[in-house]
């Protein structure tokens, strides 16, 4: 079997500066995910970092608005000092302070993802001794980020098994490219994290499809649902069309919730100009069927998002159909901040990923 290993510690350099250990991170190979993970880890460990060449290999390198919102959110909740926190910056220095619970409001000012900002601040806030409430404004259904529905139905229930209690409520959807969605979140103190295992998803219980529309013809959602219904032989009772509260701009998202005995996955498709409703549904169906055709418990998008909470808990394991680049880079970065090892090995049930202190 092929194996992979993100050793503890991974490659990094430390420099003593103003009595604080600073980790040097090469940001050229990763995207915003690398930055968000570094911000979370820095606040959780009290270790500062300097990230250089941020998103250097992207068509628009440097910090974009949603990345800057994540930096500013982390700075605010953690009373941190930053150098280079501005649009387009390719180098950032982040020196964490004391994380304080409370009520916070953050806005990306565009369709930049509100859910990615939420995932940045969740870990340090659940380590506080009092609850926090958040109001996040921006994109809630963005093709390059977890949807608000994925957060509510897949990500947070997975965290619950690790011992983390958080919830979200969607006040107003924010579709790409206009954004302007509003998402509320509450985070409770996590008094004891558990070593959770996501190895067997159990028996299939249900599949349901939801078409979300704002400012668009209902016929678009009807065609999407008809296509998904045919691909998965779904009854009419499993197909739901929702015209949601008007957002800042028109939009369409297509959701497929696949519930098994031990785990629920949420797949999200996004309507876009020039792509037919049928093609939106077919692409979503292909993604879901690829996961259903495996014996792995966790689908690709959730897999790299489980590493950080499992590392903070000191251990955990899951199976997933593939090892993504995001998972590899997340594993390497976590090893720079925390005394954990992350190993993956190919098995008949897919890749088994193990986090151990």
What are these regions (language model features)?
Residues 144, 161, 200-300:
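Conserved mixed alpha/beta catalytic, RNA-binding, or beta-rich assembly cores of soluble enzyme
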Residues 68-169, 184:
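A generic, well-ordered mixed alpha/beta core segment in the N-terminal half of proteins
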Residues 21-42, 47:
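N-terminal basic/disordered segments at the start of proteins
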Residues 317-357:
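C-terminal functional modules
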Residues 45-62, 131-136:
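Glycine-rich phosphate/pyrophosphate-binding loops
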Residues 81-85, 131-132, 163-173, 232-249, ...:
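Flexible, glycine/charged-enriched surface loops at secondary-structure junctions
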Residues 95, 99-101, 107-111, 127, ...:
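Phosphate/diphosphate-binding glycine-rich loops and adjacent basic-rich segments that engage nucleotide
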């Amino acid at each position: 079997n092929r194996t992979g290993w993100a050793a503890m510690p991974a490659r990094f350099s430390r420099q003593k500066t103003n009595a604080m250990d600073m980790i040097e991170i090469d940001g050229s190979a990763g995207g915003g995910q690398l930055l968000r993970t570094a911000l979370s880890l820095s606040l959780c460990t009290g270790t500062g970092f300097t990230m250089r060449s941020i998103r250097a290999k992207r068509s628009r390198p440097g910090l974009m608005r949603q990345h800057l919102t994540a930096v500013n959110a982390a700075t605010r909740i953690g009373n941190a000092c930053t150098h280079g926190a501005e649009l387009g910056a390719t180098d950032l220095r982040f020196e964490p302070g004391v994380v304080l619970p409370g009520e916070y409001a953050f806005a990306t000012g565009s369709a930049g993802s509100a859910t990615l900002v939420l995932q940045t601040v969740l870990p340090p806030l659940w380590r506080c001794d009092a609850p926090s409430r958040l109001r996040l404004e921006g994109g809630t259904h963005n093709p390059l980020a977890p949807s608000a529905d994925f957060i509510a139905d897949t990500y947070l229930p997975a965290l619950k098994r690790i011992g983390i209690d958080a919830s979200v409520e969607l006040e107003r959807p924010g579709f790409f490219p206009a954004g302007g969605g509003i998402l509320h979140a509450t985070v409770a103190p996590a008094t004891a994290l558990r070593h959770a295992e996501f190895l067997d998803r159990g028996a299939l219980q249900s599949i349901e499809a939801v078409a979300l529309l704002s400012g668009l013809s209902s016929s678009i959602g009807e065609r999407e649902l008809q296509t998904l219904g045919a691909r998965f032989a779904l009854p009419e009772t499993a197909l739901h069309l929702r015209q949601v509260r008007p957002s800042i701009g028109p939009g369409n998202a297509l959701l497929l919730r696949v519930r098994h005995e031990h785990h629920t996955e949420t797949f999200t498709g996004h309507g876009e100009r020039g792509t037919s409703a049928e093609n939106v549904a077919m692409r979503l169906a292909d993604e879901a069927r690829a996961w259903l055709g495996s014996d792995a418990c966790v689908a690709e998008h959730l897999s790299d998002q489980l590493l950080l909470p499992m590392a903070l808990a000191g251990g955990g394991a899951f199976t997933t159909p593939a090892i993504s680049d995001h998972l590899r880079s997340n594993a390497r970065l976590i090893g720079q901040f925390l005394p954990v090892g992350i190993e993956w090995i190919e098995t008949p049930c897919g890749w088994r990923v193990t986090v151990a202190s």
